[in-house]
Amino acid sequence: MAAADRPFLSGIILAAGASTRMGRPKQLLPLGDRCLLQHVLDAAVASRLDEIVLVLGVQAKEVREAIRLPDERSIRVVVNPDYAQGQSSSLRLGLRSASPQSVAAGILLGDQPRITRQLIDRMAEAFLAAGSAIVRPLYAGASGRAVPGHPVFLARRIWLAAEQLEGDEGARVLMSAHPEWVTEIPVDGEPPGDIDTQGDYERAVDTVRGETIRASGQIEPGRR
């Protein structure tokens, strides 16, 4: 919960999409011991974010029933009836649903289960230190070429501009139009990639399975 002596930060999880490339609601896909969206939600709940706005859309009732919401955190679930109009409609609803106390919103994608509490906290602290309108991570990437990603923090003073975005335009449009607004924070490793296709999902399942096996001290199949 919010501490009296620190700025209030909101987190907005965009999880309303129709998953057209996947062909089924990816929010509900099992990944380890939880559904895919629960991984993102759990990381946000564990972070220093003071509230979480979870934006649902397609099959909102089924998704809401599949996730666990802890009682001790301020979590607001909102349903975007216009999710077919693209991600911008969910971003707009999320910003408008955030607390009036909030000085910024950290934007997370509901199909990035590799996001971590540590990364969210690092970006939150970087935002507060930078004083910029936008702060985003810049991942090193396996190829050595820097790759921008999420979570992206947007200062309240540019929310009105973000609410004018249309279709599937995300904050990247604002960053392209106003590079002077942006501070990029170098982060080691690969970005927490989206789960857009069956192949993406299968790779995520394999990764989680391998982590579970290693954590238990067992030997992975095929390794001796």
Identify the function of each model-found stretch.
Residues 3-148, 161, 180-188, 209:
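Nucleotide and nucleotide-moiety/phosphate-recognizing core
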Residues 150-154, 193-195:
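Short glycine- and hydrophobic/aromatic-rich loop-to-beta-strand nucleating segment
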Residues 2-8, 160-224:
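Conserved alpha/beta core of the MobA/IspD/sugar-nucleotide pyrophosphorylase nucleotidyltransferase superfamily
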